[in-house]
Amino acid sequence: MSDRIRVRYAPSPTGYLHIGNARTALFNYLYAKHYNGDFVIRIEDTDKKRNLEDGETSQFDNLKWLGLDWDESVDKDNGYGPYRQSERQHIYQPLIDQLLAEDKAYKCYMTEEELEAEREAQIARGEMPRYGGQHAHLTEEQRQQFEAEGRQPSIRFRVPQNQTYSFDDMVKGNISFDSNGIGDWVIVKKDGIPTYNFAVAIDDHYMQISDVIRGDDHISNTPKQIMIYEAFGWEPPRFGHMSLIVNEERKKLSKRDGQILQFIEQYRDLGYLPEALFNFIALLGWSPEGEEEIFSKEEFIKIFDEKRLSKSPAFFDKQKLAWVNNQYMKQKDTETVFQLALPHLIKANLIPEVPSEEDLSWGRKLIALYQKEMSYAGEIVPLSEMFFKEMPALGEEEQQVINGEQVPELMTHLFSKLEALEPFEAAEIKKTIKEVQKETGIKGKQLFMPIRVAVTGQMHGPELPNTIEVLGKEKVLNRLKQYK
């Protein structure tokens, strides 16, 4: 095993980048960077039937968007390649042959139907399903007979009996498995493709991976991988298994869970900021010292401590994600937020598909109005409904405000002044409201609340003069005149 910290994120291109996988990649990245080590991306693409055409590209694209820059992968060979499992058969085959020659593995000719019948019988007896070793000691004659029948063999690893496999997990502490509870398992499928637990151990060894950090759904894979290391006399890496991510019902995050968006692509499409998503994911199952929760990537690298990875499940808190992204939104320059929001405004037909300079200028003012409230760029559409829809029916509280005794006088003065106002801009509108205050003697809530309700139909909202400017003179005058 390498003295240098070398970790890997090894996705299958069978789907897009999931929040859970993004977290695995992120913690591996932080661990490597904290110790000035290497972050390696290896593509486990042996499941040809399930691989998506753009699955690999999507993984890389979204990792890059999140800010997870890798040191080695298919595009950066550092002498440990190939970095796609499908291109490593020449590495696996001599090792498979060695295990067969040393009788540490054997060919199994049982059919899927026979294996399923065995499994069902074991379950019916209340036993844990496991392979019973029927083909563990075939004679050469028996093997030839099965091959004459056209049976294709898988290759099984011969599990040593009465042995304990232990490892000191960096998150969970000491974990042990009794080998007698593990049946002889398949290392090469009937189609000649190595299985996950075999290939991953070989790859980790030859790529000199020092630490394997992954979700705790992989704990049961670990003894099988340790068996492979021991069979070849290799030193296993250190293992760390992160707690699951759970939803509001404290159930494991499932890809079928419609309450939570689960793919990085979806957050990109909605206009979340990559540095905000990085920050939020980094706090899913890990916590810094102190109360602060907003950190830059560089700060996370500096303070990351694997000892602070949590044993307890990590709660995916949608409200917290909204809060974190809002913190970053507030700090961003308006132009960046506007460019993120523009596709959403166009999609909602609020800005033309080919916008004029006037449209773009108006859009920038709209964003400036709501930027401090936005949880994500796409939220500009529901937030700014009052600019595009008819005035909503007033609620009871709004009715009380607009029916105030001084409202007709207030609206009459304001209407006449705004009608004559040029340019119709926030600074001038603010002066105009002050003039109305002096002329009428109406001030404070009695001044501002009726104006806001009259032009927006709402009791609260962003800066009133800016809101009036963005609404535009025609719309504002139409709304004011009904209350004169």
Curated annotation (Swiss-Prot):
> What protein does this entry describe?
Glutamate--tRNA ligase
According to its UniProt entry, the protein's GO biological process terms are:
glutamyl-tRNA aminoacylation
So what does this one do?
Catalyzes the attachment of glutamate to tRNA(Glu) in a two-step reaction: glutamate is first activated by ATP to form Glu-AMP and then transferred to the acceptor end of tRNA(Glu).
Subunit:
Monomer.
Sorted alphabetically, which keywords does the UniProt record give?
Aminoacyl-tRNA synthetase, ATP-binding, Cytoplasm, Ligase, Nucleotide-binding, Protein biosynthesis
Query: What's one Pfam family the UniProt record gives for this protein?
Result: Anticodon_2
Q: Where is this motif: 'KMSKS' region?
A: 252-256
The gene name reads gltX
- In this chain, ATP is annotated as bound at K255
Subcellular localization(s) per the UniProt record:
Cytoplasm
Quote the PANTHER family the UniProt record gives: GLUTAMATE--TRNA LIGASE, GLUTAMATE--TRNA LIGASE, MITOCHONDRIAL-RELATED
Q: Which InterPro entries match?
A: aa-tRNA-synth_I_cd-bd, aa-tRNA-synth_I_codon-bd_sub2, aa-tRNA-synth_I_CS, aa_tRNA-synth_I_cd-bd_sf, Glu-tRNA-ligase_bac/mito, Glu/Gln-tRNA-synth, Glu/Gln-tRNA-synth_Ib_cat-dom, GluQ/Sye
Q: What class of enzyme is it?
A: ligase
Per the UniProt record, which EC number(s) apply here? 6.1.1.17
Question: What Gene3D superfamilies does its record include?
Answer: 1.10.10.350, HUPs
Listed GO cellular component terms? cytosol
Q: Which NCBIfam families match?
A: gltX_bact
